[in-house]
């Protein structure tokens, strides 16, 4: 199999409206090319001025995806990793803020020899250097670059100009542009409208870029007549107009693009020949399990602070898709707003009716903390499968301290610096840190598991590596009273100082982790903790259904009614 002499570049842009799915398109194309034997990497360029998304609100940006090397990046990198089963890195995500920062730093060091620093050429040249960086350092055949934003946005123009110049320098056989547009369906007229796509291509042409391939998102499949019309008015071959209609799950997108022969059109245009046929048997089986689960469905409640915006929990939600397929069930998600549970009259039994497991999600700040703690207490006392991630694990230790260890005023110093029992405290090396951006404990770190624990049972090994994003940790001063009351510290850092995993032995499934397992779950490698949690929730759900059959019933568990002293203020 002959490798291409030069790395081939594919740039993915989007038009008409945002949130069309450029990330899913890029990941799907990358997966198809990889399945043909090509070595593929994907990178994301964001036009905002922030250096990285690490300090951005989840309401504006969604989740922050952390790589092994500690980069805080765009959530689209999660799609890249889940689809390609390849790790990304710091160089996989570039923001305009980082570009400007680099240019200004160079100017301060005198590297421009006293010249007037301008967008053209200095900023554009910096972007071009970064665009080629991954291609130079990686062992690659194809590099896919997703350009964030929508054609017409002012902030995206430098990226587009850099792409235009690169195509001129490299030649059309080494770089192509795939433009993703929207073809709306007008119900009143019962037809698809191509005019928005035509206008989007016109705006792209104004930047000097003629798209090589058009991918058209639509509610309904595109007819041959529609494709011919789009091709005719957008100056592309109708074979290069790819339809991408709505589907039940994002994991069907690669199969739809394969049917539309997008990968073959890309390979032909880039001169890539003699590569194998893709073997997507596993992918088809996975999609079949997602769409037609053998054992029915269960519901998992995700308790969080940002439930109005599900993208804040994107990797967690996708991890449940993977774990559901591996357990032959569909996992339905019920988002639980933590603040709602802080009222004294909150009815947990009603809110959690039909819920077979509770995950308390990551987050920062004191808003909604007492609600999270009450959800954890309910899960612990009612023996409902519980899974806490990062802040969720910290809240679990606070709840355990207050209601089991009788440390009534226990808290985290993040929420109460003068708490009498600081069971969660700022990490020692964080106490002198002043800046917020990029200063947390970030990236992949090793963890040693305790033999005989639930964590060891699901991982089936002693040493694991997981990704982190936190400043606070469990306070080791309180280890003894916790262990005396039944808490197991089943995972720690290799030196034993930092608590990574806590669990309860006398519970159906009660596990809290300081790290972020959702960042390492992939289609072909479901994360063992998510698999185990869904398995426990499935057993709990099916057990409840058996109990509800019309046979002699046992006495029901008493309803949960926390004392006033336990409720948040």
From Swiss-Prot:
Keywords: ATP-binding, Glutamine amidotransferase, Ligase, Magnesium, Metal-binding, Nucleotide-binding, Pyrimidine biosynthesis. The keyword Magnesium applies. CTPSs have evolved a hybrid strategy for distinguishing between UTP and CTP. The overlapping regions of the product feedback inhibitory and substrate sites recognize a common feature in both compounds, the triphosphate moiety. To differentiate isosteric substrate and product pyrimidine rings, an additional pocket far from the expected kinase/ligase catalytic site, specifically recognizes the cytosine and ribose portions of the product inhibitor. Allosterically activated by GTP, when glutamine is the substrate; GTP has no effect on the reaction when ammonia is the substrate. The allosteric effector GTP functions by stabilizing the protein conformation that binds the tetrahedral intermediate(s) formed during glutamine hydrolysis. Inhibited by the product CTP, via allosteric rather than competitive inhibition. Its EC number is 6.3.4.2. This is CTP synthase. The gene is pyrG. Belongs to the CTP synthase family. It catalyses: UTP + L-glutamine + ATP + H2O = CTP + L-glutamate + ADP + phosphate + 2 H(+); L-glutamine + H2O = L-glutamate + NH4(+); UTP + NH4(+) + ATP = CTP + ADP + phosphate + 2 H(+). Pathway: Pyrimidine metabolism; CTP biosynthesis via de novo pathway; CTP from UDP: step 2/2. Homotetramer. It comes from Chlorobium limicola (strain DSM 245 / NBRC 103803 / 6330). One of its GO terms (molecular function) is identical protein binding. Residues 299-543 form the Glutamine amidotransferase type-1 domain.
